[in-house]
């Protein structure tokens, strides 16, 4: 698999800008970042560990 060329990245960013608009772009980026963060947490099992700690403290 090869990396996209710089002009391809610019084209993709322009298409995203046209679709979402400049005002919505920060919200889209924030949502994407949160989604990736939650996905990584789910893969590492961090949520399960937090739940176990809360149960232990509540007992």
UniProtKB/Swiss-Prot annotation:
Pfam name, any one: TatA_B_E
Top-level taxon of the source organism: Bacteria
Keywords recorded for this protein, A-Z: Cell inner membrane, Cell membrane, Membrane, Protein transport, Translocation, Transmembrane, Transmembrane helix, Transport
Protein name: Sec-independent protein translocase protein TatA 1
Function: Part of the twin-arginine translocation (Tat) system that transports large folded proteins containing a characteristic twin-arginine motif in their signal peptide across membranes. TatA could form the protein-conducting channel of the Tat system.
GO terms assigned for molecular function: protein transmembrane transporter activity
Biological process per Gene Ontology, one example term: protein transport by the Tat complex
Membrane topology: Single-pass membrane protein
Similarity comment: family membership: Belongs to the TatA/E family.
HAMAP family from the UniProt entry: TatA_E
PANTHER family registered for this protein in UniProt: SEC-INDEPENDENT PROTEIN TRANSLOCASE PROTEIN TATA (PTHR42982:SF1)
Record's keyword annotation contains Phosphoprotein: no
Protein source organism: Aquifex aeolicus (strain VF5)
GO cellular component terms given for this protein: TAT protein transport complex
Subunit structure, as described in the record: Forms a complex with TatC.
NCBIfam families assigned: tatAE (TIGR01411)
Location in the cell: Cell inner membrane
Transmembrane parts of this sequence: 3-23
């Amino acid at each position: 698999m090869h990396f996209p060329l710089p002009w391809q990245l610019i084209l993709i960013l322009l298409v995203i800008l046209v679709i979402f608009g400049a005002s919505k772009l920060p919200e889209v980026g924030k949502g994407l970042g949160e989604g990736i963060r939650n996905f990584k947490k789910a893969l590492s099992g961090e949520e399960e560990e937090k739940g176990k700690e809360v149960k232990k403290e509540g007992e």
